[in-house]
């Protein structure tokens, strides 16, 4: 993913018309659009094929299954045109290897969750986040997901992965994270959803976040 604006839109709306409208409005300010279950369950994977005409798409399915099932999920996502997928790492190295193998075949990216951004994200992830980050490096993943709500954790993860992997960081805006703070902590991109798509002017909201990061 080309680092231009350092902003990823989390497009967690549920209908096609709204999704395409917002995506088009913010296209000048985002490097990628992240879609998850709310939109894909509502509109099907075909929405990915439409969104990739606007910006690269990351499928946030937090893939977490046995290797064969993970492989099938990744193949469907990448065949739909997604440029990347988000997976969990707690299912182990063989499951992650399966995702990375498919991504390598398609020339796409895998981002591994190290620690989630909501308060409950520390309950079980905190003790294993560093191990997951190390595994992501060893498996050849493209990057990791680390919380903008806890910039100190982004610093910790960056120390482990070095400059080999990218960090994409959710939790800016509605969850309380600061885009500028987490970029300073070592994130490559921030992921922002509600603060943009619930705004009266998504483009202005996206521009404001970009300005905060001086991008």
Curated annotation (Swiss-Prot):
Catalytic reactions on record: orotidine 5'-phosphate + H(+) = UMP + CO2
Name of the molecule in the record: Orotidine 5'-phosphate decarboxylase
Function: Catalyzes the decarboxylation of orotidine 5'-monophosphate (OMP) to uridine 5'-monophosphate (UMP).
Quaternary data: Homodimer.
A GO BP annotation: 'de novo' UMP biosynthetic process
Pathway assigned in UniProt: Pyrimidine metabolism; UMP biosynthesis via de novo pathway; UMP from orotate: step 2/2
Top-level enzyme category: lyase
MF terms in GO: orotidine-5'-phosphate decarboxylase activity
UniProt keywords, alphabetically: Decarboxylase, Lyase, Pyrimidine biosynthesis
Family indicated by similarity: Belongs to the OMP decarboxylase family. Type 1 subfamily.
SUPFAM superfamilies membership: Ribulose-phoshate binding barrel (SSF51366)
Binding site for substrate: 12, 34, 60-69, 117, 170-180, 193-194
Gene Ontology terms: cellular component: cytosol
InterPro entries to which the protein is assigned, alphabetical: Aldolase_TIM, OMPdecase, OMPdecase_arc, OMPdeCOase_dom, RibuloseP-bd_barrel
EC id: 4.1.1.23
Catalytic residues (UniProt): 62
């Amino acid at each position: 993913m080309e680092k231009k604006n350092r902003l990823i839109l989390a497009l967690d709306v549920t209908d096609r018309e709204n999704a395409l409208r917002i995506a088009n409005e913010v296209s000048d300010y985002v490097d990628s659009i992240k879609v998850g279950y709310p939109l894909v369950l509502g509109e099907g994977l075909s929405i990915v094929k439409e969104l990739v005409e606007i910006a690269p798409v990351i499928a946030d399915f937090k893939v977490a299954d046995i290797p064969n099932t993970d492989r099938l999920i990744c193949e469907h996502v990448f065949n739909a045109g997604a440029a990347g997928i988000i997976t969990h790492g707690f299912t182990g190295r063989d499951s992650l290897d399966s995702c990375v193998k498919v991504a390598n075949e398609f020339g796409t990216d895998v981002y591994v969750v190290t620690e989630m951004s909501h308060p409950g994200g520390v309950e079980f992830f905190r003790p294993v986040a560093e191990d997951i980050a190390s595994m992501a490096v060893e498996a050849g993943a493209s990057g990791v997901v680390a919380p903008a709500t806890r910039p100190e954790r982004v610093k910790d993860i960056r120390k482990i992965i070095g400059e080999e992997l990218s960090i994409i960081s959710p939790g800016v805006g509605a969850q309380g994270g600061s885009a500028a703070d987490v970029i300073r902590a070592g994130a490559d991109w921030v992921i922002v959803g509600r603060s943009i798509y619930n705004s009266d002017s998504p483009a202005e909201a996206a521009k404001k976040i970009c300005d905060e990061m001086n991008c």
